[in-house]
Design a protein with these regions (language model features):
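Metal-dependent phosphohydrolase cores
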Residues: 1-204
Length: 204
C-alpha cells in the first residue's frame, strides 16, 4: 500500500515524463487519467504489486530504473567506448515504451468484489465488461492509437512483448524488445521476493 499523497505524486511525475518524452495525450488523461492513476500493476497480493496506484509506482520506481541501468551499465559507454553497440537501445525510446506499456491495466483490472477470491490473495480481478479479449500489450497499443500517441515500429513491437510466451531465442528480435522483456521479468522477481521477505519479517 502507498499513501494517497504518494499516488498523486507518482501520477504528477508520470505525466511530466510523458510530456518530456513526447508521448503525452491530453485526451488520454481527461478520459481515463483517474483510472490510470489508481490502477494496479498486478492482480495477486503475492506478486508484491497488487495495490491501488501500483501500476505507475512500479513503472516509475522499478521498471524504468532497472531497464535504464541495464541499458547504460551493461550495454552503455565505458571510458568513452560503447561496450556493445549492437545491443544498446535509444534511451528515449526505451523510457517512452516503459511509461506506456501497462496503461491497459487501468481498464483491464478492477478491485476485487468476491470475498472468497480476496481471501485467496486476489485483490484485483479482470474487468468482465471488456468488449474484447485483447491482451495487455495489445490493448495498450490500441489505447495509444485511440488517443493519438505515435509509436515507432520498434516501440509497437516492444509494448506487445509482454503478451508473448517464452520461445526459442530469435536473433531477429530487437534489442529494445529483449531489454523490455528482461526488465519486466526482473521487476516481477524483485517485487515477489521483497513481498515474501516482508511477510516473513511481519510474522516474527
Amino acid at each position: 500500500m502507498i499513501s494517497e499523497e504518494k499516488i498523486n505524486l507518482n501520477y504528477t511525475r508520470w505525466i511530466e515524463r510523458l510530456k518530456h518524452y513526447d508521448c503525452y495525450s491530453e485526451r488520454l488523461i481527461d478520459e481515463i487519467g483517474d483510472k490510470i492513476k489508481n490502477a494496479s500493476f498486478s492482480l495477486q497480493e503475492s506478486s508484491g504489486a497488487a495495490y491501488q496506484g501500483s501500476m505507475i509506482d512500479v513503472v516509475l520506481n522499478n521498471l524504468c530504473v532497472i531497464a535504464c541501468h541495464l541499458n547504460s551499465l551493461a550495454f552503455g559507454v565505458n571510458k568513452d567506448k560503447v561496450l556493445h553497440p549492437y545491443l544498446q537501445v535509444n534511451q528515449n525510446s526505451l523510457i517512452r515504451e516503459l511509461l506506456l506499456q501497462h496503461i491497459a491495466k487501468a481498464e483491464m483490472f478492477i478491485l476485487q468484489t468476491n470475498q472468497w477470491k480476496a481471501k485467496q490473495g486476489y485483490l484485483f480481478d479482470f474487468n468482465p465488461n471488456m468488449n474484447t479479449c485483447l491482451k495487455c500489450g495489445e490493448r495498450t497499443t490500441f489505447l495509444c492509437m485511440k488517443y493519438g500517441i505515435e509509436l515507432t515500429e520498434e516501440e509497437f513491437e516492444a509494448i506487445r512483448i509482454i503478451d508473448k510466451e517464452d520461445s526459442v531465442a530469435n536473433q531477429y528480435i530487437t534489442p529494445l524488445c529483449q531489454l523490455v522483456k528482461m526488465a519486466n521479468q526482473l521487476v516481477s522477481i524483485e517485487l515477489y521476493r521483497k513481498h515474501k521477505e516482508q511477510n516473513k519479517e511481519n510474522n516474527y
